[in-house]
Amino acid sequence: MVKVNVIFHSIHGHTYKMAEAIAEGAREVEGAEVEIYQVPETLPYEVLEKMGAIETKNLFAHIPVVTRSMYEDVFAGADALIFGTPTRYGNMTAQMRTVFDGLGGLWSRDALVGKVGSVFTSSGTQHGGQESTILTTHVTLLHLGMIIVGLPYSETRQRRMDEITGGSPYGASTIAGAEENRQPSENELAMARYQGRHVTQIAKKLIG
């Protein structure tokens, strides 16, 4: 059995939909046990309400929120960890950063060394920092000792030129639009499924 956990942060639901697609692809691998978690939201209700995010947050309210008491099971207990975060100025969101910053105890005893790590993202525009967000998140994964897996060009959908689409060798991504009203396309969701499957296959090989 290979255990894969998908951990995401989402406000308007785009990263959540990609997370579901990632998990769907991971579950296609025989013997895979896949769970999805969301990180705690740090924005107050009033701010989320002004952002028009209450309704969209409710769409994935059923997804468990990963708390510090769960870090051992969710992080140290997995063979592969796939992280999803929207872009914030070319980096992960503060909500996701807070979770990573809380992993010091696991880091200090090398609990994540040798585990497979992968990242996916979303942004408001085509050039909204998708690649830099994934790459800067990779830096954190490297400090934790993880083995990074991206989205290889064998997933040919990232080569498409006939439509606006996310996706790069660094990981799957989606473009939400400036008003957050564009939903992940089938092409983007297919790349997310590929990434989930690819990461899980590699993790399965590594654990023998």
Swiss-Prot record:
Amino acids binding FMN: 10-15, 87-89, 122-128, 143
Keyword terms: Flavoprotein, FMN, NAD, NADP, Nucleotide-binding, Oxidoreductase
Molecular function in Gene Ontology: electron transfer activity; flavin adenine dinucleotide binding; FMN binding; NAD binding; NADH:ubiquinone reductase (non-electrogenic) activity; NADP binding; NADPH dehydrogenase (quinone) activity
Residue span(s) of domain Flavodoxin-like: 4-199
Residues reported to bind substrate: 107
PROSITE patterns (UniProt xref): FLAVODOXIN_LIKE (PS50902)
A GO cellular component annotation in the UniProt record: membrane
NCBIfam families in UniProt: flav_wrbA (TIGR01755), PRK03767.1 (NF002999)
The protein's name in its UniProt record: NAD(P)H dehydrogenase (quinone)
